[in-house]
Amino acid sequence: MINIMFVCWGNICRSPMAEFVMKDLVEKRGLSSCFHIASSATSTEEIWNGVGNPVYPPAKKELAKHGISCEGKRAVQLTKADYEKYDYLIGMEGINIRYMNRITDGDPNGKFYKMMEFAGEGWKELMAGKRNMERAGDVADPWYTRDFSATWRDVSAGCEGLLEYVLVMEADKL
């Protein structure tokens, strides 16, 4: 089983979009039973009295335009225990990585990545050992841009590259 956690600030836009795009990609390849895919927030801003808000309606609508449902998803916060549970923890932007480090007390096993490290040919550079998290851009934040299609493009490119990377790196688990 390959365990992937996508992380953003509130877990109502970018990280749930990534969660459900990735689930869709692995399902289309017939690999759903080989993956556990989830998403979480670094903050509790979208969690009230222990209950997370649902996916932000425009993000949900963008997923639906591409035939993907995120029904039932509610915001949850990343925990220290998640570090041991997941093989890959994918932040949407640099500030997410910073807070992920705080929540989990660091990344001693090199499990943290920025989503855009995998986009385009990025996953091939990672395969070649050419990792540069600082160079990788951030996933467009639709909370501020209101451009959910730009976020869709970033998330899709990142998830496609991540899947290619994982299929090579984790071939023995498939």
Identify the residue ranges that each predicted region occupies.
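Conserved active-site segments centered on acidic
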Residues: 1-85, 166-174
